[in-house]
Amino acid sequence: MADQSLSTEEYPTEIHEYLMAFENSVGSVDEMLKKMMSVSRSELLQKIEPLEQAKLDLVSAYTLNSLFWIYLTTQGINPKEHPVKEELERIRGYMNRVKEITDRKKAARLDKGAARRFIKHALCDPTSEEAPPAKMDCKAKKKRK
C-alpha cells in the first residue's frame, strides 16, 4: 500500500485482509495491462480474425470502464448514477451480440446433399405394393419403372 506506516492495530484485521486482496488484484490487473500494452495494437490485430478483434476491443473497453467504475467508488462517487454505468451496459450489449454470432458459427450446419441422400434412402420402401422383390435396391426399382 502507499502508506506502510499504518499498523494493522489502527484498523480492524478484516479490513486489512480486504485491502491486501485488493492490492493483489490491482497488481494482477497491472501485470495483464503491461503484457497487453507491450505488443503494438496493429501487430496484434494483424494476427487475429475480425471476430477475435471485436472480442479484444470489447474486453479492453469493458476492462477500462470497470477500472473507472472502481476509481469512482474509491472517490466516494456512486458509479450507478454516473454515465459509466450506461457505457458498461452498452458494451455488454455488444458482447452479447458477438456471443450470438460466435454461437451461430459453432451451431450445427445442415449438409443439404447429405440430408437429401438420407431422405431419399429412408423413403425408399421396397415393401410397398409396387415393390420389386426384397433383394432389389431402390436404384433397381427406379430402372424397372
UniProtKB/Swiss-Prot annotation:
Plays a role in the recruitment of the exosome to pre-rRNA to mediate the 3'-5' end processing of the 5.8S rRNA. The lineage of its organism: Eukaryota, Metazoa, Chordata, Craniata, Vertebrata. GO terms for molecular function: DNA binding; RNA binding. Keywords: Coiled coil, Cytoplasm, DNA-binding, Exosome, Nucleus, RNA-binding, rRNA processing. It is found in: Nucleus; Cytoplasm; Nucleus, Nucleolus. Monomer and homodimer. Associates with the RNA exosome complex. It holds the Pfam family Sas10_Utp3. Residues 84-109 form a coiled coil. It comes from the Eukaryota. Belongs to the C1D family. This is Nuclear nucleic acid-binding protein C1D. GO terms for biological process: maturation of 5.8S rRNA; regulation of gene expression. The keyword Membrane does not apply. One of its GO terms (cellular component) is exosome (RNase complex). The keyword Protease does not apply. Its main location: nucleus.
